[in-house]
Amino acid sequence: MRAVLLTLACATALTAGCSRESAPAPAAPAAHPAAAVQTPSRSHDESSYAEPDKVVIKDLALDLAVDFDQKILSGTATYALEWKDKAAKQLVLDTRDLSVEKVEGQAASGAWAPLTFQLATADKVFGSKLSIDSPEQNKLVRITYKTSPTASGLQWLEPAMTEGKQLPFMFSQSQAIHARSWVPLQDTPSVRFTYSAHVTSRPDVMVLMSADNDPAAPRDGDYSFKMPQPIPSYLLAIAAGDLNFKAIGARSGVWAEPAMVDRAAKEFEDTEKMIDVAEALYGPYRWGRYDMLVLPPSFPFGGMENPRLTFATPTVITGDKSLVSLIAHELAHSWSGNLVTNASWKDIWLNEGFTTYVQDRITESLYGKEMAEMERQIDQTELLAEVKDMAPADQALALPPLNNRDPDESLSQVAYVKGAWFLKFLEERFGRETFDPFLRSWFDDHAFQSATTDQFVAYMKKNLLPKAPNAVTEAELNAWLNEPGIPKFAMKAQSRGFSNTDTARIAWLGSGQLPNAQVTNEWVTQQWVNFIGGMGDKLSVEQLAQLDKAYHFTGTPNGEIAMRWYPLTIRSGYLEARPEIAKFIERVGRRKLIMPIYAELVKTPDGLAFAEESFARAKPGYHPITTASVEALLARAKAGQTP
């Protein structure tokens, strides 16, 4: 998952299908859920109730119906289980706001019989523990259930909230722990399973999943999917809407609403080249196809690396490819994250730091070293600003146990930028001729597995450090992994491409003379970001008006510029921007782009009132994850806790 040019943390199933007919259950009283019990403590993974040391899901089959009227998914989930502990008698799953109708187990005879289950009292962060009694250690268990209309991992959009405004839209966001809100699962990245699915819907929408989507499949309301590679639960994904497909290359293409699909295909036309670059560096792409789905602007993140079907925000479609590093990032996850996965969310840097580093390498290869350097410098500058307000423990790559913290809220730029900076440090110390083969071997040796920071450190000490024994000290490794902040010996990115923007800004601030249009016409998004970002805390209204007249920042369709320009106007009292600010935060639900604007607004009473009014209008179109973030910010502001 990636927020391009990140400034705030972004933080996004099934065997050959379960049979619609089953053998009659033996004569016995129907099992009913026991009374709700208190939420028990969690072990193994602080964010999951699952007990994978006792029993693990190996394959999952979904048979679901999409109901746009009720805004629910309903049906069955069938689990193929591997029992590891011969004494275990329970299957424990994670759920959130699910209605469980019944649970059945298949006996050795093939007959299905009801199983007793208990659904614990819900925890506000982790949901409800579902305990299923299985005294015979059933190899197949089936749950009949339905989701809530307010499931945190699903968003339902009315036609008016889509590009085409004709058909409704639904999509999921399972990372970090939202898969449990639409499928009962061992919702931990330490468990991987293959899956298949049968999904029915209204016949005028196309349904897609993080699986083998067929571009030629008829739009008939009846769809089947299969994912033969094992994935963790957070990569389970589904979407349904008015979607068309356009091929980009032999194994890549774009799904989008009809009005968007051509623009998206043009913007992402280098995707096949990106795959080639990544394969040359880190080995074969192991997921078959790499397709992308462009979602409505309410999608709360920049992208989500769902295997075979990356979910992407339309806010990166600028017409000049200046933000396609998002696709490089999500593609890079095909090695770092999807192939080798953090074992728990406290090790998230193994996903996001590695991916940001691989993204930089792809960007450098296709768009030049200068582009990669500009993006690194922006990321590093913003990380250094962010850590000033962070607790020291949160600034380490190797995080302490999250305990009761929501992993969505514990994610910061540290995992992305400090993680990538650390790998860049290793690359510089050992040289690419040594570091590139090492990183490839890490991916190869841990393919389709989950890993911890301790495992990576042990692997590095065995396979990298001996190649140049004096290149890195234990103290330096400890500074990167376990100490707060950025080590003083870290080399900072320095982009030559920012020299003109810095010079132009300094000259304008001193003389009021804007740079020549022939110069600024050549600037890419990253240079405009640097130009605005160096303006300081405030400008005069007259200065902002001059910039606006020349560059039309107010009302810009470029989210990376908007998220920096609008906070500057708010701090400076430039009220002329307010109408466009309202339009922007009511149209876009991507947290990275709108949270800095809300955070600036709530610092004053009139700004807080404006934010509340805008949010009230925007909320029906926001994703539940975005809604929760804004509501928490507004609540803190009203309590006197301004950002």
Indicate residue ranges for each PLM-predicted region:
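Mature, folded catalytic cores of secreted/periplasmic enzymes
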Residues: 48-56, 61-65, 69-71, 78-80, ...
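Acidic/His-enriched low-complexity segments
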Residues: 18-288, 430
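Hydrophobic alpha-helical and helix-loop surface patches within well-folded domains
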Residues: 21-31, 100, 225, 254-505
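Short, solvent-exposed secondary-structure capping/transition elements
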Residues: 153, 434-435, 574-579
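Hydrophobic pocket-lining residues within nucleotide cofactor-binding pockets
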Residues: 98, 230, 316-317, 570
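Gram-negative bacterial Sec-dependent N-terminal signal peptides
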Residues: 2-19
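Long, ordered, helix-rich scaffold segments
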Residues: 412-414, 418-419, 446-452, 464-643
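Short, glycine- and charge-enriched coil/turn segments that flank and shape catalytic ligand pockets
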Residues: 85-87, 106-113, 136-138, 215-222, ...
